[in-house]
């Protein structure tokens, strides 16, 4: 978000942090990495030019480490992890890294000018609708009331806050620092422990 803790960072810097943290937690020679695969939905501007490759270089991996960026819209990061794993499973690689990056505060959705969301004739071929409308439609079709969903959301926030407090995310979260080493973000800033169904 524009006023969030990460808004001053570039997408390349953010994408490089997990790669750097991986070597800090598990020291290894980066030349052993056969491929790095990153997902990115809007690979233009600061996220353009094969952001996976830029992240590899920014993380100070050996320049020989290859990388590629893929786009499967909202599933891009997950698809990148699956793609990286598939290369190992198929015997095409011994060591791969998969992940993803998207900084909508710096590269907003639609910045690529893609036809699917902007060309009504093309969008009509798949009944393209934005996520908010799609979520409302699915909730209506499946009989989920607003009250039920708000109650579930509030409960989810409380559970997430408790999990943070108990340190359950410690192994999977990396504090994000800027290039000077100043810590900008160490925990998820979107969890609201004090939220309620009424406030939602």
Annotate each predicted stretch with a short phrase.
Residues 89-142:
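Flexible glycine-/small-residue-enriched beta->alpha junction loops
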Residues 47-48, 106-109, 180:
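Short glycine-/acidic-enriched loop or helix-start segments at secondary-structure transitions
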Residues 7-17, 25, 148-200:
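N-terminal extracellular/periplasmic Venus flytrap/periplasmic-binding protein-like
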Residues 72-101, 139-169:
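Active-site-proximal alpha-helical scaffold in enzymes
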Residues 1-41, 45-55, 59, 66, ...:
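Conserved active-site "lid/cap" helical segment
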Residues 9, 37-93, 125-133, 194-199:
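Conserved catalytic cysteine-centered active-site region
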Residues 31-39, 66-71, 96-101, 148-155, ...:
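Beta-strand segments within the central parallel beta-sheet cores of soluble alpha/beta enzyme folds
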């Amino acid at each position: 978000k524009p006023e969030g803790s990460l808004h001053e960072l570039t997408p390349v810097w953010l994408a490089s942090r997990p790669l750097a943290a991986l070597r800090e937690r598990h020291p290894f020679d980066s030349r052993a990495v056969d491929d790095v695969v990153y997902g990115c939905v809007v690979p233009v501007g600061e996220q353009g030019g094969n952001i996976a490759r830029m992240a590899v270089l920014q993380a100070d991996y050996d320049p020989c480490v290859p990388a590629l960026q893929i786009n499967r819209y909202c599933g891009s990061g997950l698809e990148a992890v699956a793609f990286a794993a598939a290369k190992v499973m198929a015997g095409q690689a011994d060591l791969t890294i998969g992940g993803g990056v998207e900084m909508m505060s710096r590269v907003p959705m639609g910045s690529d000018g893609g036809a699917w969301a902007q060309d009504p004739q093309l969008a009509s071929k798949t009944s393209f609708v934005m996520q908010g409308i799609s979520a409302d439609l699915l909730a209506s079709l499946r009989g989920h009331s607003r009250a039920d969903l708000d109650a579930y959301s509030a409960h989810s926030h409380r559970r997430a806050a408790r999990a943070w407090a108990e340190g359950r995310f410690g192994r999977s979260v990396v504090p994000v620092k800027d290039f000077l080493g100043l810590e900008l973000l160490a925990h998820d800033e979107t969890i609201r422990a004090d939220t309620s169904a009424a406030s939602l």
